[in-house]
Structures are given as C-alpha cells and as structure tokens.
Amino acid sequence: MENVVIIRYGEIMLKGNNKRFFEDKLVKQIRHALSDLGKLKVYKAHSRIYVDVDAYDVADITDRVKKVFGVVSLSVAKRFEVDMDRIKEVVLEEIKDRMLENPGIKTFKMESKRGDKRFPMQSLEISRELGGHVLENIENISVDVHHPDVSIHVEIRDQAFVFSNKISGFGGLPLGTNGKALLLLSGGIDSPVAGWMVGKRGVDIEAIHFHSYPFTSDRAKEKVMDLAKILSGYCGAFKLYSVNLLPIQKEINEKCPEEEMTILSRRFMMKIAERVALQNDCDALVTGESIGQVASQTVKSLNVTNSAVDLPVFRPLIAMDKVDIIDLSQKIETYETSILPFEDCCTVFLPKHPVTQPKLEKILQSESKLDVEALISAALEALEVEKISIED
C-alpha cells in the first residue's frame, strides 16, 4: 500500500481540443512547486494528477500543491491493488484513524466511484457493502448521508484508492497559459490581491513598484519586497522593478496645480510601467484600483489615467467592496504585511483636495508644462531590478 496525493482540476476539463495543453502546464507547475524536495513522481491519469508521496513530508507537499493555480482540490489517499476484502480493511483503518483524531465523530457516509467498469459491483452497491462492514465492526457510529461527521471516499480504477480528506485549492488556470502582465505593486492591500487574481487566470506576472526615497523609507521598500515574496508563492518567481518617482513629483509640485498631483503622478506611473512592460514582453498592465475607493479611482479619473497608455489595463478589483478585498488578502496571507504602517509614494505631496472629476484637456494642459519624455527617461535610467522568489 502506498500514499498518493490525488489532484483534481475543474475549468481545464472544458477546454476541448486544448485540454491536454492546460493539463501539461498544470503538471509542469506542480512539479516546479515541488522541485526542491527531490524527484517526486508527478503524473497524469484518468483526468487527475497524482503525486507519489511515500517517504516525503505530506503536509508540506499538500500546502504547496494547493497554492498552484488550476488545482481545485486534492486528497491524500491510500493506493493498493483492487480487492474487496482489502478495501474493507483499509476503509476500517481510515475511519478509525479519523475517530482517533476526533473522538466526536459519530456519523459517517460512504462515497464510492467505480471508474473501472470491469469491477463487478456498481458504485451504490460498493457503498452499501462498505457501509455495512463499518457498522458491523465499529460501535457507536451511524450513517448520515446528508451531514456526516466524516465522509470516506473509495475510488476503483486500475487500483483502489481510499481517502477521507478533501483540501480545497484556488482553482483557475495554470500559470503560463494566458500571456504575461506587469503589476503596479504598491505596499497596500489592493495591488497584491489584483496580481494574485490575474495570476489565477493563468497570466504570468512581473511587478513594478514606485517609491519616493528618501521621502519614503527603506523599510517601505522592504515591505513591498515581502509582499512580492508572498505573491511569488502563488505566481512563481518574477522580476520586481523599482522606480524612484520623487524627481517627477517635485516637478509636478513646482509647475502644476496642487489638486492635480495625484492624477498626474498616476499618469507618469502608467507611462513608465508601459515602457517597462513593452521592454519585457508583457501584454498588459495590472492595477489594484476599485471604482470610487479614492480620489484617483473615480470613473473619470480612471479614464484620464487610461489615456496615458495604449496597453490594456486589467483591474480585477474594479467592482469589489473593500471588505471583500480585505477578506481575500487575508486568505492569501498578504494582509498582515500590507497594513504595516510604512508610507508609500502616494503619501508624498498629497493634496488636501485632490481633483475627483478631472477633465483630460485640462490635465494634458498641465502635463505640457513638464518635460515628460526627459522625466520618464531619467526614471528608467535609474531603474532597479530584483528577482523575487519565495525561496529567497
């Protein structure tokens, strides 16, 4: 008998003629997530992916695999030759183990799947036979098919599988199946969630961060690095580009109306991000903006910001409430880092009354007072790049 992780995927099943491409990408991503653990056997069969895990830390493996985009759920199962008497023994062992872990278990349910049609019993018959065996051999337990304390699963294919746990994954599509995008990563709550959401749709990401050093601190930059490392646990290793926006902000502060500081700064960020994206084969920009959340995120403000670039701008949080964004940031474990009290470039020269309904003509008029190309070129010349990985 061997231990194996059974990995299930969902949306990939709907991909028709492209299904194999997505499956192969998912296998590749799972292998990559486990690559430093040794030569684990990861393989595809019966529209599932399997990882042989004997002699390995199973908890570590499941924790890594559940973060791989495309994985809907996984289970740690016992695998052995198909034999009904042996299946009965393993089912008893499984339910007894669960009862030792949780003495409060009083009800159970059997769920059986007969993938191998050569097996003489149908799925419902298998469940009845095994359920009866449990009732005959374990005291103080009963069947509850609607709200059981524990469900025991049996799958019969070329071999038999028995398990009682289902660990949820995040679903989505495997990384590397939908191009590459550049994430504008701040130190806040929203942008890491936006990057995660785009990654979940199979988009590889790189990231760019704007700071205002020395008006913003080294610790603020370290915070962004920490967020990027958490994100790399889901999205894989990526490049983080850092740009000092302070010289541009000083020029805006000196030559443009105070209330336009935020919107003009955002336009410069987008222009610089687009240059970096195009130089690195990115197909889109990604931001954490949500309608109406702050002054620069009204519909008119977003329209003025968009007009600064030609690349598509993905805003996966656009209609989400803040509480929903916070919930997701907690789920992906970026929240506690995001709320650390370190300033970012948006706090520098913050206007008392930022324009919320900007007119593009007026913003372009103010922008014409600046040497836009020279400011962008200087920022790009001072660009810093770091490779971000969860292992760092």
Curated annotation (Swiss-Prot):
UniProt keyword annotation of DNA-binding present: no
EC number: 2.8.1.4
One Gene Ontology CC term in the entry: cytosol
An example Gene Ontology molecular-function term: tRNA-uracil-4 sulfurtransferase activity
Location of the THUMP domain: 59-167
Subcellular location as annotated: Cytoplasm
Task performed by this protein: Catalyzes the ATP-dependent transfer of a sulfur to tRNA to produce 4-thiouridine in position 8 of tRNAs, which functions as a near-UV photosensor. Also catalyzes the transfer of sulfur to the sulfur carrier protein ThiS, forming ThiS-thiocarboxylate. This is a step in the synthesis of thiazole, in the thiamine biosynthesis pathway. The sulfur is donated as persulfide by IscS.
UniProt name for this protein: Probable tRNA sulfurtransferase
Species name: Alkaliphilus oremlandii (strain OhILAs) (Clostridium oremlandii (strain OhILAs))
